[in-house]
Design a protein with these regions (language model features):
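Bacterial N-terminal signal peptides that target proteins for export
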Residues: 1-8
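Bacterial N-terminal signal peptides
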Residues: 10-18
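Sec-dependent signal peptide cleavage junction
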Residues: 19-29
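A cross-family detector of function-defining hotspots
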Residues: 27, 40-80, 107-187, 191-201
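Short, aromatic-enriched amphipathic alpha-helices that serve as compact interaction elements
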Residues: 31-38, 94
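Second-shell loop/turn segments in exported
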Residues: 94-101
Length: 202
């Protein structure tokens, strides 16, 4: 019962980040705000594993925390702050992401009006941010779309790259991955140039 109450509190806090009825655009401020709210909600939960036992010698300082909704990779075995969270993998509908999307929703709901161009390439750019540095692209295979990814950069030093990825199975979002990583302005601008180059060739 206590766990269910904590999970209910977590879900309530997480869903404050966006309505699942309509997917929103994704920019650095939105990504950063969502991470902060997620970290605050996460502090109400206890992992189902012992994160201290998950330290990978090949990746020192990184711990894997397991929860009912999925996993969190963080730079601590304790309660992580937003800055300490490196990756979130969501496998259930218990978490709403920064764009208002949950696992189980459709590809069309995740795209929110964006269209995937006809291309023989394995990567298709859907749009770029009007302000700031960011873009969205889709991963394409023989079976159609198997992933859609938003990237956006907080260019305030130290520069941070936020990545939001939807794993697509058929026409359904089967997983959501959120990542935050250190970057540079040069890397952000190079990535945007690559996205624009791909878009120009479509």
């Amino acid at each position: 019962m206590k766990f269910l109450k904590r999970m209910a509190a977590f879900c309530a806090a997480a869903m404050l980040t966006g309505s699942a009825a309509l997917a929103q655009e994704y920019d650095a401020q939105q990504a950063k705000s969502w991470m902060e709210q997620f970290a605050q909600a996460l502090s109400q939960l206890a992992p189902v594993n012992d994160p201290a036992q998950t330290l990978d010698p090949a990746r020192p300082g990184e711990y894997l925390q397991e929860y009912e909704f999925g996993t969190v990779q963080a730079a601590t075995s304790g309660k992580p702050t937003a800055a300490q969270i490196e990756e979130i993998d969501v496998s259930t509908a218990q978490v709403t992401d920064a764009r208002g999307i949950r696992v189980g929703m459709t590809l069309n709901e995740a795209l929110n009006g964006l269209s995937i161009p006809q291309t023989e390439a394995n990567l298709a750019v859907l749009n770029t941010q009007e302000a700031g540095v960011g873009w969205c692209w889709a991963y394409l295979g023989e079976g159609g779309v198997y992933g859609v990814e938003w990237l956006t950069y907080d260019l305030t030093e130290p520069v941070t790259e936020y990545t939001l990825t939807y794993v697509i199975d058929g026409d359904t979002v089967s997983g959501i991955r959120v990542k935050a990583a250190a970057s540079t302005r040069a890397q952000a601008e190079a990535g945007l140039a690559t996205a624009q180059e791909i878009a120009d060739k479509q």
